[in-house]
């Protein structure tokens, strides 16, 4: 995350202490989008926390369930094509922040941005980094 900042990027979330991110595994374990969001909201209330909730959706059925449920502030479109992202942004219609994630590269970044999303996650920044071979020599 530090290298992203140094390179001019921004981090919209540092950890689970500043925003709840409900991923696909959480959704599956909870028994669906509505159950996962509701449990996260109940947890926040019980702990006296005022945290934003982001829900990851994998398809249009999950997107519709999230929209029907509400209670979150951001929707992450996971592995949506550019065309599907554009359609999803139209369906969301500004009611929630929208993040695109999954399979986005520096070559496709502009196309996703032009869909009108608020945030774009580019995993290649962290999982496909080319290392630089450096060494230091001690001099007496």
Task: Please identify what each model-predicted range represents.
Residues 16-17, 24, 49-51, 94-95, ...:
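Short coil/turn connectors at secondary-structure junctions
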